[in-house]
Amino acid sequence: MRITEILALFMVLVPVSLVIVAMFGYDQGNGFVQASRFITMEPNVTSSSDDSSLVQRDQEQKDSVDMSLLGGLLVSGFKKESCLSRYQSYLYRKASPYKPSLHLLSKLRAYEELHKRCGPGTRQYTNAERLLKQKQTGEMESQGCKYVVWMSFSGLGNRIISIASVFLYAMLTDRVLLVEGGEQFADLFCEPFLDTTWLLPKDFTLASQFSGFGQNSAHCHGDMLKRKLINESSVSSLSHLYLHLAHDYNEHDKMFFCEEDQNLLKNVPWLIMRTNNFFAPSLFLISSFEEELGMMFPEKGTVFHHLGRYLFHPSNQVWGLITRYYQAYLAKADERIGLQIRVFDEKSGVSPRVTKQIISCVQNENLLPRLSKGEEQYKQPSEEELKLKSVLVTSLTTGYFEILKTMYWENPTVTRDVIGIHQPSHEGHQQTEKLMHNRKAWAEMYLLSLTDKLVISAWSTFGYVAQGLGGLRAWILYKQENQTNPNPPCGRAMSPDPCFHAPPYYDCKAKKGTDTGNVVPHVRHCEDISWGLKLVDNF
């Protein structure tokens, strides 16, 4: 019986062993089973599923990179740790409804190459700077590199919008933009261009003369026009010209916006510019720029929105201020409302008229709910009804913040929304030259740009920056005149772009005054300043 069982077991095991050997084979050289033939016998479901996950993950990473580069507006290659905001900002704001045109992207890539070739530290830059040291005799040769230098001037909001304008001009005229500002500027903003710098070197030949540049300077464009010292012949021997385009410029300075003068400026290697204006609207009225600008910006009212997001990335120090505050006070809200309050002619304290105007605006426009009265205030909202709105207030004082905070703490709202009022700082007054003041100002502008809806004050470049970066059509609190409340208290902006506060009113061809807000449909008068100019669409 025992022998029979052993034979039966042997008869079963031998065929099975032969089948296994036939299927797998055996490599005597390395002792490993050859499984290649076996692997092809049936599909590996797990492997296919993993491949699908990898493809999906790769696509998500690709989409993430594309979002962080703002639809091609930015380029990769920067060290992420050197400028966290460049790669993280998209996580804090909704995707822009405005897409940069392919022509704008092409112009930006071409400019980046120009800046890399001609920027500080290159042989071309050194040769071009030598022209400033030579005696001005004969024609100047700058080896194809020309420059426009932005002089540090005015408050931070004005600086940001004016630099964007100068950069646009640089792209239109194939010049390299260099900005004065030194360490403080570098403390606020990351470098926008890869493998180069946009900061004017401290030892720049003319830097020591900047404080003396003015409307009566020997090389001032406007003054030379006034004295009839500038023409096609004389300009060819100039190494530089000073352009005074600040709010107080005169009729001769404003000739900068004429075609004839642009033709003269083409031949000057160095243009030194002082401006605190967003003068882009008037560039659209120069015939030689018109077609190019139209291709760069099919949506005319998005010039600062695109250029601002391209140029201005908060430094790591400022980005820390932004992200810490956002996470602490804004991240969990169902809706974020920005409220930028700037009262220019109020000596001190809180104005009851301004308070009334603010409350009327936010409630009439359904940005914040009205207060509940009577029996209704005792009804508790359900979980579904409960909605948190976080209001970010920016102001030099705390008065308006305290009023709103108390109002929405002590009273329920008719919508049962819970309203949180927050204010990051209250500096008392503008302190342009203080580093921490500017850090906070830049952080607050950026925080406002991250909100879903925004209210800004008339005339304020602080608000313009926030509106433009966010691509928002803000509600503008109209400026009070003769101590009376405007009716309506606020109105919606026509586009996200800033207002040009001091435009020229001159027809260069006819050589006479004209209303430059009625020349083309996309350059209109501003909502908050009747004489200002603004780029708009479909109005």
UniProtKB/Swiss-Prot annotation:
Residues in the Cytoplasmic compartment per record: 1-5
Glycosylation sites: 44, 231, 482
Disulfides per UniProt: none
Enzyme class: transferase
Single annotated GO MF: fucosyltransferase activity
A Gene Ontology term for the protein's cellular component: Golgi cisterna membrane
UniProt-annotated location(s): Golgi apparatus, Golgi stack membrane
Membrane topology of the entry: Single-pass type II membrane protein
The protein's annotated pathway: Protein modification; protein glycosylation
Enzyme Commission number: 2.4.1.-
Keywords, alphabetical: Cell wall biogenesis/degradation, Glycoprotein, Glycosyltransferase, Golgi apparatus, Membrane, Signal-anchor, Transferase, Transmembrane, Transmembrane helix
Membrane side Lumenal: residue ranges: 27-539
Main location, first listed in the record: Golgi
InterPro entries per UniProt: XG_FTase (IPR004938)
One of the protein's GO biological processes: protein glycosylation
Tissue expression per record: Expressed in roots, stems, leaves, flowers, siliques and seedlings.
Function statement: May be involved in cell wall biosynthesis. May act as a fucosyltransferase.
Family: Belongs to the glycosyltransferase 37 family.
Name this protein carries in UniProt: Fucosyltransferase 2
Naturally occurring in which organism (per UniProt): Arabidopsis thaliana
Originating gene: FUT2
